[in-house]
Amino acid sequence: MKIHYRVKKNTIEIIRCYGTDSRVVLPEEINGLPVVSAAPYAFSAHKDGEEDAETWESEEAFSFGEERLLAGEEVQEIVFPDTLKEIGRYIFYGCKKLERLEFSDTLMQVGTGAFTGCSGLKELVIHQKK
């Protein structure tokens, strides 16, 4: 999996994800910095343009096929790390096939309209931070 991100105050904000699997598991750290937020529209196919970003690639990633943007109808499950504190507005906008989300009780802020168009969401797992 490939992740586009930006550094904000010595923390990481996820901007976009690319891969071959419809299941996204985000890391707790990138280059030694904690992943604490996911940008507005990060998993939405409706996002206009791309922002300046750095790229991180999973070391254990070995995939068959061409990587694609994991957004909109391309994503079915997202597992956020225990370090995540905030998800941006309209982050899942139009993710009709998104069925499962997992995050911990450290998530403190959910942006406006985050679940707009998530008609297939069946399971929301919230666990206590380890």
Over which residues does each language-model region extend?
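Structural signature of tandem-repeat unit edges
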Residues: M1-N10, Y18-V36, D48-E86, K96-Q109, ...
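Consensus positions within tandem repeat domains that build extended binding/scaffold surfaces
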Residues: Y41-A42, G88-I91, G111-T116
